[in-house]
Amino acid sequence: MSAIHPTAIVEDGAILGENVSVGPFAYIGAKVSIDDGTSVASHAVIEGRTSIGKNNRIFSHSAIGTIPQDLKYAGEDVELIIGDNNNIREFTLLNPGTKGGGSVTKIGNGNLLMGYVHLGHDVILGDNCILANGATLAGHVELGNNVVIGGLTPVHQFVHVGDFAMIGGASALAQDIPPYCLAEGNRATLRGLNLTGLRRHIPREEINALKSAYRELFEEGKALQDVAQRLFEESSSEKVKNLCKFIKTSKRGIPFTRKS
């Protein structure tokens, strides 16, 4: 049974699962679906065609599913899909997709979106990511799994960030960051591998293979695409293959400077 505060507004047509709680002065629109065990705190606004999974915690003053911040938006039927077990902290802004970007924004499972985080239209966010306070993903940005974005870091439209990458706080990211890498600065550039994150999740032999590949790709003065193609074909490491595939398919380029 759901627990809805008497001052909350839940429009006719909204679907709430078992043990959903809705706090004081929250608003749930008519096209919203919220699955079992999710809590919505006071003054949160959830509207539009928004689907929210199980056991999410949505904190006060979040704005979820409000129309995209895109001047081309003309009232099309667009969607926001949120998975399970996410923590969406205070004053977070999550927009649905647009017709020009597939009409859907997708958020995976187990993510922590800290205060004042913004996910723009058509963003694709994987699982188990951490976006620190004030991080901003512009339209069409794609993040893999286990990505960390530091506080107050904006990410440019259409940028892709691979699995287990980390972006330092107060950076400005305008190009693609390959999986397993660390980047920081304004504009952000590669600073090495995200060894802290890798050691928590990836065997040592895979990390050693990534270290060797990183040196050859970014530090030895060789043509990046040529090295990526060769390592993709020759390496027995799946992680190295993933790294090289990302580089080969990057559309915005990889920001790095070679050591002198």
Swiss-Prot record:
Molecular function GO labels: acyl-[acyl-carrier-protein]-UDP-N-acetylglucosamine O-acyltransferase activity
Keyword Acyltransferase appears in the UniProt entry: yes
Positions in coiled-coil regions: none
GO cellular component: cytoplasm; membrane
Keyword vocabulary terms for this entry: Acyltransferase, Cytoplasm, Lipid A biosynthesis, Lipid biosynthesis, Lipid metabolism, Repeat, Transferase
InterPro entries: Acetyltransf_C (IPR029098), Acetyltransf_C_sf (IPR037157), Hexapep (IPR001451), Hexapep_transf_CS (IPR018357), Lipid_A_LpxA (IPR010137), Trimer_LpxA-like_sf (IPR011004)
Subcellular location: Cytoplasm
Enzyme class: transferase
Lineage: superkingdom: Bacteria
Assembly with partners or alone: Homotrimer.
Keyword Acyltransferase: yes
One Pfam short name: Hexapep
Gene responsible for this protein: lpxA
EC annotation from Swiss-Prot or TrEMBL: 2.3.1.129
Catalytic reactions on record: a (3R)-hydroxyacyl-[ACP] + UDP-N-acetyl-alpha-D-glucosamine = a UDP-3-O-[(3R)-3-hydroxyacyl]-N-acetyl-alpha-D-glucosamine + holo-[ACP]
Family: Belongs to the transferase hexapeptide repeat family. LpxA subfamily.
Protein name per Swiss-Prot or TrEMBL: Acyl-[acyl-carrier-protein]--UDP-N-acetylglucosamine O-acyltransferase
Main location: cytoplasm
GO BP, one annotated term: lipid A biosynthetic process
Purpose of the protein: Involved in the biosynthesis of lipid A, a phosphorylated glycolipid that anchors the lipopolysaccharide to the outer membrane of the cell.
Associated pathway: Glycolipid biosynthesis; lipid IV(A) biosynthesis; lipid IV(A) from (3R)-3-hydroxytetradecanoyl-[acyl-carrier-protein] and UDP-N-acetyl-alpha-D-glucosamine: step 1/6
CDD domains (alphabetical): LbH_UDP-GlcNAc_AT
